[in-house]
A protein has these predicted regions:
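Buried, small/hydrophobic-residue-enriched core segments of structured protein domains
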Residues: 1-256
Length: 256
């Protein structure tokens, strides 16, 4: 398959928006010539889905997707793995791409951080990127001619009674996952993770680029002169509160 044929088929099928570009994180311009393509095989954001679990057994289909995607750039296709864990065979045994092991806490899984350290963008440069599940979707299009935007998502957060993985489709109503599954109290429901997701209502839909639904307590209660208190029940990364004396303690964090 040539680059022109791949682009034409992706545009005709409606799957082209799966491919985004940096800078700016917008849908890629099919007329551009990207210097490289990035795929982050892991998400380091809080409670994010574990791609190593999701991709168990999808080795051949994922490789087909990589072969197709690699035709879109004359540069390298970077597949970035979590160096702190053992990656799924679909990732660690991938061929025809440059495999990079990334170490460290969040935001190590952020595509912008990875681009900055591996292939920095200069003036006039464009880099395309997509997610591992996007690669599978594109592979299915060319293998079976299917427009298949099914995906595996994680429903997470301390307000969720039964956190688990679900197979669903892009844009589905989140009611299917949170009905009778929320703890008591006012909840902040997020399409995506708590750091970069979007606030949504109970009858809204899952974002097109999201693989996670998060529900945490809404921080709608204030504490009088709370800044004066020792803060044994408040998490602090910088040791502002005395909670640092109990480093193993777990916190139920809200929007405050």
């Amino acid at each position: 398959l040539s680059k022109d044929v791949i682009i034409s088929d992706l545009l005709a099928s409606g799957l082209w928006p799966l491919i985004r570009q940096r800078p700016f994180g917008t849908i890629a311009n099919p007329s551009d010539k990207p210097k490289s393509i990035f795929i982050s095989a892991f998400d380091s954001s809080p409670l994010a889905p574990d791609n190593d679990f999701i991709f168990h057994g999808d080795t051949n289909l994922f490789q087909l997707g990589l072969d197709i995607i690699s035709q879109l750039s004359d540069g390298k296709t970077h597949l970035n793995l979590d160096g702190n864990s053992n990656s799924a065979n679909a990732f660690s045994n991938a061929k025809g791409v440059q495999i990079n092991n990334i170490y460290g806490p969040h935001p190590s899984g952020n595509i912008g951080v990875q681009i900055h350290h591996i292939d920095p963008i200069n003036k006039g440069d464009v880099i395309w990127y997509l997610t591992p599940q996007d690669v599978l979707t594109i592979a299915l299009l060319f293998l079976e001619g299917k427009y298949d935007v099914s995906r595996i998502i994680a429903v997470t957060g301390s307000q969720i009674r039964r956190p688990k993985y679900y197979r669903t489709i892009a844009g589905t109503k989140i009611t299917n996952f949170i009905k009778d599954n929320l703890n008591e109290g006012n909840s902040r429901i997020i399409s995506g993770d708590v750091l970069s997701g979007e606030k949504i209502n109970k009858d809204d839909s899952l974002g097109f680029y999201h693989y996670q639904i998060t529900a945490i307590p809404e921080g709608d209660k204030s504490q009088f002169l709370g800044w004066l208190l020792p803060g044994f029940h408040k998490y602090s990364f910088s040791r502002t509160f005395f909670s640092w004396l109990t480093p193993m303690k777990k916190f139920d964090l809200d929007t405050n």
